[in-house]
Amino acid sequence: QNSNNSVRVSNDFLEAVENDGKWDLIQRINGKVCETVEARSLWDKISHAAWACADPGLQYDTTINEWHTCPKGGRIDASNPCSEYMFLDDTACNLASMNLMKFRHENGDFDIDNFEHATRLWTITLEIAVMMAQFPSKEIAIRSYDYRTLGLGYANIGGLLMAAGYSYDS
């Protein structure tokens, strides 16, 4: 509780789960195997914890790196705590979210024109933020400037769907 945890799994791990195989737990510092466990048992523990308290989140390492938009820059090894930003080590992302309910008219219509306009404005704002940001290290500043890491998302989709009359299980 009061933390945000993720577990990163590879396709090899998922295959070990499917095949009732064993899985080596690797120490991050020295790369040595510290324990070998039943993959399915570990998967069950991860799944139960996620069901019980919404943590850990899952990150699919193989897919993340297969879909990597800048693979020549290196592997994607980590994310920010909420996992909405996954990119190269020594980068930072300036994040913003737009509240979708602000684009809902009283009659229930979604204001696409203003949503598109706000998206353009926020993209420019985030671009300026990258140029003005004070990053914690020179390496992070250089890579963030080079790759222009912007993150524009949306919030309150649940509220928008409820206001439109969609039930949670639809």
Predicted regions and their residues:
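Function-dense linear segments that define catalytic or interfacial modules
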Residues: 50-164
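Conserved, charged catalytic cores of large soluble enzymes
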Residues: 1-74, 166, 170
